[in-house]
């Protein structure tokens, strides 16, 4: 195999023509039978025979025959410098690169180059923080038999090196180039990309459950939960045979807050400290999350218009079939009650079922606030919990504390009169469509949730700046609980024209208003109904858009509404009030001149000339009418041709 090489040296260029042949008689050595060094500018030509040991011996190296004295007669016996490289390197002709050699074929344990090579630019310099080394192009004086070109356009060979094969900690390194059939050492293998947050159970958002251990034998869950005021709960799990209980919060930030508050000093219950540990993490179900976002669901069910005959036993019989009840509180003077369940799913079932039940149509059944969410007064002085690894774990309560009106769509109305009706409150709202309208007449308060943030801010500013009275009382305004962004399902439905107002037509004439209300109330709480019996049509406004969506999908299936047309109608809360017509010419943009112009034409004799320099055109675009003195006005302006009667009275001389 013939190979042409050009090796650049300092001050000279050497051209080498080599023919490497396999000499079977030379014990498997490669013999360079024609190794002719022609040095330009020298007195002669140096010829030498070089051999490359190709054996499997670990001590194989480059050897040269007669390294000190040239055997070529034309050279005149000129002595040359020793051209032997460091014996710890060998040449890979096929790969055209050289790799440090050791006992196992990979990285050497130690390298001791000769002193003259330490200062050489071709000697490889290793960095402690790097796992690879770049070999620059060596001069021919050090590596005469290296098949390396000095041409800068040819890429330089790379050799990977590590100073310690067994690191205490795996690190990422470039791919090692081992010999065939030998795996790379452990230090050269790429480290696995592992993150503690890759698993769904490693996210901080899922750590919502806490185990309370070391409970007394005779304890009540209601007594224990009355001491917890860190945030609303999703469920409470207890086992009668074990003296422990598992409480699951809706928000992981509340769970961390409760743990950090009571873990150092202990949670004291019945004179004994309880053990606090985190349970297995579990994500919040999507169905419960949507219900909490849309309807502010909780474990607490609020009951309004409660009959006086209902006591705790009757309520437990009526609501106990949906799930286990944790606590019941009845306010007989206000005819209201609060029922706390052990699981939020049971409370959702109650609201969805009984709010549409005709037997309970006179009751007001909705969600109340969880009594575990009542924070102590010192909460404002504490800092809110935020995870450094996951900033999204900041609770909604903390965000509301930082900025009350930052992206909030819920407006609070207070100081309402007892005679105030729900439709009267909606008649005051003309700033945008509503997502939810929750009026609590027993507490004289109301919560209005708009579709957009801008509409909520406009309505809040309107009530804050203007003195709005309703039944003689000024309405107090504030911000309610942060509503968060609009759910994607409602957002898409609103873009398609959905609203809380539903139009129906072509219904049976035999239906009365009471019967129609019972049918429409099956899909949710109603704010107002407008029934046009003569036209067999009407409008129903629900308190929530979700209820209106149920009615639009469910009414066409009803037997009495098969022939009727059901569709959404615009929400009246997003329609601006029509301004009353005014007789003021300024508000009607009517020129004032037509009102001050007399209803008759002046005689020519009574029309004074327009003074010079005056503008005959006013801003109104009507010809200027000069001012006429009182004496020049005729006595009878009904006709301009009437004679001029004397202006004196017949009784002046009497």
From Swiss-Prot:
Domain RRM: 299-355, 409-482, 500-571
SMART domains: RRM (SM00360)
BP GO annotations: meiotic cell cycle
Subcellular location: Cytoplasm
A molecular function GO annotation: RNA binding
Cellular compartments per GO CC: cytosol
UniProt-listed PROSITE patterns: RRM
Source organism (scientific name): Schizosaccharomyces pombe (strain 972 / ATCC 24843) (Fission yeast)
Cited SUPFAM superfamilies: RNA-binding domain, RBD
Residue stretches of biased makeup (Polar residues): 384-393
Name of the protein in its database record: Meiotically up-regulated gene 24 protein
Alphabetical UniProt keywords: Cytoplasm, Meiosis, Repeat, RNA-binding
Cross-referenced Pfam families: RRM_1
Record's compositionally biased regions (Basic and acidic residues): 394-404
InterPro entries per UniProt: Cwc2/Slt11 (IPR039171), Nucleotide-bd_a/b_plait_sf (IPR012677), RBD_domain_sf (IPR035979), RRM_dom (IPR000504)
UniProt-annotated stretches for the region Disordered: 383-404
């Amino acid at each position: 195999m013939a190979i042409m090489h050009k090796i650049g040296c300092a001050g000279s260029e050497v051209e080498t023509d080599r023919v490497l042949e396999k000499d079977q008689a030379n014990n498997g050595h490669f013999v360079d039978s024609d190794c002719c060094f022609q040095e330009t500018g020298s007195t002669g030509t140096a010829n030498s025979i070089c051999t490359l040991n190709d054996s499997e011996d670990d001590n194989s190296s480059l050897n040269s025959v007669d390294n000190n004295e040239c055997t070529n007669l034309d050279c005149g016996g000129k002595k040359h410098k020793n051209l032997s490289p460091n014996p710890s390197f060998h040449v890979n002709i096929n790969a055209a690169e050289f790799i440090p050699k050791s006992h196992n074929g990979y990285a050497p344990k130690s390298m001791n180059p000769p002193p003259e090579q330490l200062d050489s630019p071709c000697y490889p310099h290793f960095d402690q923080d790097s796992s690879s080394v770049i070999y620059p192009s060596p001069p021919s004086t050090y590596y005469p038999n290296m098949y390396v070109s000095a041409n800068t356009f040819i890429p330089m060979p790379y050799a990977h090196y590590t100073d310690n094969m067994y690191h205490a900690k795996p690190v990422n390194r470039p791919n090692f180039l081992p010999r065939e059939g030998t795996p790379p050492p452990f230090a050269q293998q790429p480290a696995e990309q592992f993150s503690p947050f890759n698993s769904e159970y490693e996210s901080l958002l899922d750590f919502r459950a806490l185990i309370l251990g070391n409970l007394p034998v005779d304890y009540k869950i209601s007594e224990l939960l009355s001491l917890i005021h860190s945030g609303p709960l999703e469920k409470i799990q207890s086992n009668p045979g074990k003296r422990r209980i598992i409480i699951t919060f809706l928000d992981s930030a509340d769970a961390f807050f409760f743990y950090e508050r009571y873990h150092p000093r202990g949670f004291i219950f019945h004179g004994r400290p309880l053990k606090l540990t985190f349970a297995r993490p579990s994500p919040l179900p999507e169905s419960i999350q949507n219900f909490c976002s849309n309807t502010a669901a909780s474990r607490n069910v609020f009951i309004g218009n409660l009959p006086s005959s209902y006591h705790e036993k009757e309520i437990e019989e009526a609501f106990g079939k949906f799930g286990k009840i944790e606590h019941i509180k009845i306010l007989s003077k206000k005819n209201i009650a609060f029922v706390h369940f052990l699981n939020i799913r049971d409370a959702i079932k109650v609201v969805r079922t009984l709010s549409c039940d005709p037997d309970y149509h006179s009751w007001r059944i909705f969600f109340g606030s969880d009594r575990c969410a009542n924070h102590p007064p010192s909460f404002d002085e504490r800092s809110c919990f935020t995870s450094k690894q996951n900033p999204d774990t900041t609770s909604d309560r903390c965000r509301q504390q930082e900025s009350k009106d930052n992206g909030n769509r819920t407006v609070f109305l207070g100081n309402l009169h007892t005679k105030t009706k729900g439709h009267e409150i909606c008649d005051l709202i003309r700033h945008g469509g509503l997502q939810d309208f929750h009026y609590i007449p027993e507490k004289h308060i109301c919560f209005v949730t708009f579709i957009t943030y801008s509409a909520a801010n406009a309505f809040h500013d309107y009530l804050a700046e203007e003195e709005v009275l309703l039944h003689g009382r000024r309405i107090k305004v504030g911000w309610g609980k942060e509503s968060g962004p609009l759910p994607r399902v409602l957002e898409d439905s609103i873009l398609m024209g959905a609203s809380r107002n539903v139009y129906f037509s072509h219904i049976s004439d035999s239906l009365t208003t009471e019967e129609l209300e019972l049918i429409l109330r099956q899909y949710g709480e109603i704010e107002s109904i407008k029934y046009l019996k003569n036209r067999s049509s009407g409008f129903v406004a629900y308190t929530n858009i979700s209820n209106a969506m149920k009615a639009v999908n469910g009414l066409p299936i009803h037997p009495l509404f098969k022939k009727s047309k059901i569709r959404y109608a615009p929400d009246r809360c997003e329609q601006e009030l029509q301004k009353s017509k005014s007789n003021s010419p300024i508000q009607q943009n009517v020129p004032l001149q037509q009102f001050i112009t007399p209803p008759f034409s002046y005689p020519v004799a009574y029309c004074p000339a327009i003074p010079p320099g005056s503008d005959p055109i006013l801003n109104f675009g009507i010809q200027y009418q000069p001012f006429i003195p009182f004496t020049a006005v005729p006595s009878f302006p009904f006709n301009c041709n009437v004679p001029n009667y004397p202006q004196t009275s017949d009784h002046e001389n009497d």
